[in-house]
UniProtKB/Swiss-Prot annotation:
The gene is Slc1a4. Keywords: Acetylation, Glycoprotein, Membrane, Phosphoprotein, Symport, Transmembrane, Transmembrane helix, Transport. InterPro entries: DAACS, Na-dicarboxylate_symporter, Na-dicarboxylate_symporter_CS, Na:dicarbo_symporter_sf. PROSITE patterns: NA_DICARBOXYL_SYMP_1 (PS00713), NA_DICARBOXYL_SYMP_2 (PS00714). PANTHER family: NEUTRAL AMINO ACID TRANSPORTER A, SODIUM/DICARBOXYLATE SYMPORTER-RELATED. Sodium-dependent neutral amino-acid transporter that mediates transport of alanine, serine, cysteine, proline, hydroxyproline and threonine. Residues 1-29, 495-532 are annotated as: Disordered. Belongs to the dicarboxylate/amino acid:cation symporter (DAACS) (TC 2.A.23) family. SLC1A4 subfamily. The modification Phosphoserine is found at residues 507, 527, 530. The chain crosses the membrane at residues 42-62, 88-108, 119-139, 217-237, 257-277, 298-318, 328-348, 373-393, 418-438. This is Neutral amino acid transporter A. GO terms for biological process: cognition; L-alanine import across plasma membrane; L-aspartate import across plasma membrane; L-serine import across plasma membrane; proline transport; serine import across plasma membrane. Glycans are attached at residues 201, 206. It holds the Pfam family SDF.
């Protein structure tokens, strides 16, 4: 009771003096100080949530002004600056955090944590895919939507649907990106397969066309290759021992400096989010028609996100930690708002690292090891909307999916989410792989693009939530291992003390030189002499 009074100064004063009239101003002052302290601690969260609400209201108010495309571009400029700052910091943040994280863990811990992370990512993504397929068959989003036309949904500015790609070429691209031929080029380009059609004239007069795959470099950071290189480099520096300590300290310092830059950028997030959301609402032509036409598809996707993010993932976290998952998630409101506004897991990575370490107390070695990997390979939200989209397009074309095709959707969606681009609309590109795998046309992807700006927001939130809860689980398991090791070490020390004394007391030399007399001091003196 005395200690609790000492930690709160205003409580000590209140207990020492009777609750009379003169103490009332100090009590009011104490409340105002507590309120001010609360707002200071949660200022960034409150400002970020306010930015989302103000941005939505601003967009709704400006829709009636019929802004031109140029004016909308100017309106979105502050949000564009936020995206540029976040993307600027991704490369040093990912590389330095993974190198320092991998170098700070020993080989056994790295293998154990890596194995748990891979199992967690794989199982949660597979469960998300199964949930999405079940919801799609129950809700039937494609039933009665065969007459939809993408031109009537305001899709003129969304661009053409992605080119269909063979499944084997998609996985070959994944392997190519894992091992980039040039690390500098990997910082701003990624490998992708394109196709050229070659016409052959046979001797019989027939004309045949052959589609030849051609590997090209497209714009976009090869985050998968950089992640693998950083992990291997961190392990190699750890193996070097003293020779690698200088370089490890360099990456640690670089990482800390990067986190300082992140803390500065975070104060611009509320402004950028406000203009990002406002400009996107102004840009859409007819939101009511869009939602009513594809409402069942949007509902099925978002319901899957709510169930997986609000029930499945928290239950997994509770099963491992026996802690309240929503208390853990409450400290991550700023990253969730950033994910909702930017639609990018990679752009959310800086704020996620900062908040999960400062607000939730996750070990830096854990967060900086697992979060960059999760932002690259863990896409639970993307797997949900990809499976719903695949079943939606099948129902749109009156195709009854058999058990083999459903299994193909589950496996392909889970595998395709690994290495999917952590950028806005990145998941749409992988839907073409699923459709090709089950033999469905890809021309209906334009309908998915029409509402992707809505679904992609909850998709990104679920993606980063899965990464955060995975980091929390790994942190809890690592703490258990550390505590168990400390307990075993204490037991060894406790057992060692009486054993050493008993050996000294029963030493033949001590017994011989001190046949009689007090035995409390003599053993210690003899032992000191023998050591000297």
């Amino acid at each position: 009771m005395e200690k609790s009074g000492e930690t709160n100064g205003y409580l000590d004063g209140t207990q020492a003096e009777p609750a009379a009239g003169p103490r009332t101003p100090e009590t009011a002052m104490g409340k105002s100080q507590r309120c001010a302290s609360f707002f200071r601690r949660h200022a960034l969260v409150l400002l970020t949530v306010s930015g989302v609400l103000v941005g939505a209201g601003m967009g709704a108010a400006l829709r009636g002004l019929q802004l031109t495309r140029t004016q909308i571009t100017y309106l979105a400029f502050p949000g564009e600056m936020l995206l540029r700052m976040l993307r600027m910091i991704i490369l040093p943040l990912v590389v330095c955090s993974l190198v320092s994280g991998a170098a700070s863990l020993d080989a056994s811990s790295l293998g154990r944590l890596g194995g748990i992370a891979v199992a967690y990512f794989g199982l949660t993504t597979l469960s998300a895919s199964a949930l999405a397929v079940a919801l799609a068959f129950i809700i039937k989003p494609g039933a009665g939507a065969q007459t939809l036309q993408s031109s009537s949904l305001g899709l003129e500015n969304s661009g053409p649907p992605p080119v269909s790609k063979e499944t084997v070429d998609s996985f070959l691209d994944l392997l190519r990106n894992l091992f980039p031929s040039n690390l500098v080029v990997a910082a701003f380009t990624t490998s992708a397969t394109d196709y050229t059609v070659v016409t052959h004239n046979t001797s019989s007069g027939n004309v045949t066309k052959e589609k030849i795959p051609v590997v090209t470099d497209v714009e976009g950071m090869n985050i998968l290759g950089l992640v693998l290189f950083a992990l291997v480099l961190g392990v190699a520096l750890k193996k070097l021992g003293p020779e690698g300590e200088d370089l490890i300290r360099f990456f640690n310092s670089f990482n800390e400096a990067t986190m300082v830059l992140v803390s500065w950028i975070m104060w611009y997030v509320p402004i950028g989010i406000m203009f990002l959301i406002g400009s996107k609402i102004v840009e859409m032509k007819d939101i009511v028609m869009l939602v009513t036409s594809l409402g069942k598809y949007i509902f099925a996707s978002m319901l899957g996100h709510v169930i997986h993010g609000g029930i499945v993932l928290p239950l997994v976290y509770f099963a491992f930690t026996r802690k309240n998952p929503f208390t853990f998630l409450l400290g991550l409101l700023t990253p969730f708002a950033t994910a909702f506004a930017t639609c990018s897991s990679s752009a959310t990575l800086p704020s996620m690292m900062k908040c999960i370490e400062e607000n939730n107390g996750v070990d830096k070695r854990i967060s900086r090891f697992i979060l960059p990997i999760g932002a690259t390979v863990n896409m639970d939200g993307a797997a949900i909307f990809q499976c719903v989209a695949a079943v939606f397009i099948a129902q749109l074309n009156n195709v009854d999916l058999n058990a083999g095709q459903i299994f193909t959707i589950l496996v392909t969606a889970t595998a395709s989410s690994v290495g999917a681009a952590g950028v806005p609309a990145g998941g749409v590109l992988t839907i073409a792989i699923i459709l090709e795998a089950i033999g469905l046309p890809t021309h209906d992807l334009s309908l998915i693009l029409a509402v992707d700006w809505i679904v992609d927001r909850t998709t990104t939130v679920v993606n980063v939530e899965g990464d955060a809860l995975g980091a929390g689980i790994l942190n809890h398991l690592n703490q258990k291992v550390v505590k168990k090791g400390e307990q075993e070490l204490q037991e060894v020390k406790v057992e060692a003390i009486p054993n050493s004394k008993s050996e000294e007391e029963t030493s033949p030399l001590v017994t011989h030189q001190n046949p009689a007399g007090p035995v409390a001091i003599a053993p210690e003196l003899e032992s000191k002499e023998s050591v000297l």
